[in-house]
Amino acid sequence: MDVYSASVWPRLEPFLLGALQAAPPGKLSVHYLRKMASYVRTREGCFPRLGWHMWRHIACGKLQLPEDLAWLYFETFDLLAPRSPEEKLEWAEALSQCQSPRELDRQRSKLSVDTLHFLLFLYLQQLNRVSLRTSLIGEEWPSPRSRSPASFSEREAKASSHNKNWDDQAHLTFVQTHLTEILELLAEPGELSSSGQPPRDGQLLPAALQGLSLLLEGSASHGRAVHPLHRLLGRAPFQTQAGYSKLSRSYSLQKLQSWLHQALTLNPFGMSTCLRSGKKLAWALQVEGTMKRAKIARNTHLAPPGSRVVLMSQLYKQTLAKDSEKLADANVKLHRCNEAFIYLLSPLRSVTLDKCRNSTVVLGPVVTSVHVQSCESVRLVCVAARLAVGASSHCTIHILTPTRPLLLPGNVALTLGPFHTYYPTLEDHMASVGLAVVPNLWDKPLLFGADGPTPDPASYRILPPAEFWPLVVPFQMEGDTCEVPGGLPPTYQQAVEAREQRVQDWQKTVKDAHLNKEQRRQFQVLVEQKFHEWLLERGQRQELDSLLPAAVTPSHPTDSALSTCGSQPSLHRPKEQAAQRAVGRTPTVC
């Protein structure tokens, strides 16, 4: 190997979190992005930073995109910008004080993004573009589906269920295939021929390489330190190999492209490597009678920030509860979990639920996004900067989020409800990642179609207050949070209070009946019997039973397993923790 060789790979974060998990509008094709690249360089207020008002002018006036969609892309890119928790909380407070659309627009006008980075972010939306040829080849014919004409939404949902956001091989292929077009967007307009193609003697300024660092990073041979691409090319040997000229202070486009093709490799911190050689975690139990073993792997012990990954697959009929440093600021993927109860009570970078069924998932605060893909009958409870749901059915999602929930194609019978739980360290975790209780747009979803937001009220509903029940995290932990952050919306709070009043009225009725000791015993037996029958009818007996695994000693003092030590744990309503003793003792941390 050459002493001065380098390895370059696609960064995980822009592909995982930046590319929306649906086909982009046609107006975001490379043809229109080339025009935009030339336009922003010749207009005041567009380069090197692009403000919201100028982007809205380009998106709505030039590209004919709806304003909601223009803001979606701008906001999504801004969510990835590195900001301190204090800055995020200040921004949330400013948004929450806006009382009118005009005030909101004035506040948004204070945002600006790096223009070259934003251009590449828009180009990155091509990652999940639907290929008609691939769809036709992949569709078996004749098939039962061919007897009835499939709607466009069904075909789109099928395509979106195969999104490539976690596929590091797809990331590498995307960059290798489209490297020429990517470099075109970064080149000065004068460096392109009349056909829009870079000439053989085209040049690229070092500032453009900083834009390319959004997508690429790497390391020198025999070195473990990871550098953005422009810093890696700041080293003299690599500058020479990549065609840097000290005279023109620029790179040869042809030589740079050739060097990148030779240096590009698979991301050593991606999902493939994590599955193959990541550290395995013995957090899950193997359930008798199951064909596949639960797998949990991580690379958090060696990956740089933004590339920390924890993969959990095949969790079946068990409860997994963790508050661990191994989860902190990690990108978590839950894959094919079935009839499981999962509590990940740490600050997380991002979370993806893929092909999960009949499960409950409760998350700590998520810095960027939670994505639910191809799931069925999942109950999700989380605080997150963004929620996206695609190709999923009969899922109930309780969320606190400062952005509009993004509903992608293929959803059926979703239910959106307010965030309705807490655990003792929740508010501390929220503050540590910069998530506030306001604004909270949980009930204002944005429906995303192939050509922009398309209203489809049949795909979701807002949870009726009559069906609302608070969720109690059934583990004892140290901390100060003792109620739902921000409280419940008034109509839901009223429903809870009315239900509590009915319970109190019923208890008073029992007390006023003046039952003797034998009658009280018989009545208690009857209540317990009916309660257990209700648990079986509602399918919640398994949730209680799964809280009784054998106690496991944490492998690390900061790796807390929130397992239950009591013989029969109880789930109790808020403010009634002394009541309902029929099921047993309160679970504690082992």
Language-model segments: what does each one mean?
Residues 1-355, 363, 409-590:
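Charge-rich, low-hydrophobicity low-complexity segments
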Residues 329-331, 339-341, 350, 358-360, ...:
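Detector for repetitive beta-architecture
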Residues 335, 343-345, 354, 362-364, ...:
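Feature marks extracellular polysaccharide-active and adherence modules
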Residues 376, 386-389, 406-407:
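A general structural signal for short secondary-structure boundary/capping elements
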Residues 380, 395-408:
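Leucine-rich solenoid repeat scaffolds
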